[in-house]
């Protein structure tokens, strides 16, 4: 694995069908020198898979929460132990591409930014299977967020983000669930104006396939 200033946090809950593929794809991209897997109380074989991956790769750390407390809780656990200059987040469900995350890291590093968020609604990138109601709700929330925080944001619900680690020294994250996506951006933007969105691809999975985030999470 490359020697870089990049940490990737991958929270997971009951992702036995995708976790190994997600981590393997991330490792192949060879840009993160620290990968933190956070088990959010899985009751399938996810933890065993993660443990095997940790044993295989010395740059992988594994954190376990015995109870399922939510993505926000898992992210906070990962942030607390991250040791690199920049922190990125990648879900284990294969909806987002690790290659896109690599591009976000390059963007934040080369241009001396503090926050870079992937957006599914700029550029000509692939966007498969997005529910119409999800798209419309996201557009409304993004517009509302942009007005409140005086920063144009086109994809408030994106789960692909990169931050300068020092931002977390002066903010207190409260959310334990999926509303962390909105809170983490709102609070980091309050500490920095060096923000940019970057186009990314996206392949949505259905609720039958294990999708967990719901429309209501954006309003919490």
What are these regions (language model features)?
Residues 152, 174-176, 185-203:
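Catalytic donor-sugar/metal-binding loop of nucleotide-sugar-dependent glycosyltransferases
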Residues 5-7, 34, 183:
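Cell-envelope/extracellular polymer assembly enzymes that use nucleotide-activated donors
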Residues 39-48, 94:
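A conserved acidic beta->alpha catalytic loop
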């Amino acid at each position: 694995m490359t020697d870089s200033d990049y940490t990737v946090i991958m929270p997971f809950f009951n992702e036995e069908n995708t976790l190994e593929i997600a981590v393997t794809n991330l490792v192949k991209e060879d840009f993160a020198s620290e990968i933190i897997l956070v088990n959010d109380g899985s009751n399938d074989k996810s933890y065993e898979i993660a443990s095997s991956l940790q044993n295989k790769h010395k740059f992988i750390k594994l954190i376990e929460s015995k109870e399922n407390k939510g993505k926000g809780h898992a992210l906070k656990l990962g942030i607390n132990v991250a040791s690199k200059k920049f922190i990125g987040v990648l879900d284990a469900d294969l909806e987002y591409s690790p290659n896109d995350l690599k591009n976000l890291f390059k963007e934040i590093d080369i241009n001396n930014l503090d926050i870079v968020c992937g957006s599914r609604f700029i550029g000509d990138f692939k966007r498969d299977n997005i529910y119409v109601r999800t798209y419309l709700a996201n557009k409304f929330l993004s517009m509302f967020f942009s007005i409140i925080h005086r920063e144009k944001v086109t994809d408030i619900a994106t789960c692909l983000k990169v931050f300068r680690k020092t931002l977390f020294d002066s903010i207190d994250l409260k959310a334990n669930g999926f509303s962390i996506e909105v809170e983490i951006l709102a609070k980091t933007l309050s500490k920095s104006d060096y923000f940019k969105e970057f186009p990314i691809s996206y392949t949505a999975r259905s609720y039958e396939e294990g999708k967990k985030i719901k429309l209501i999470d954006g309003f919490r």
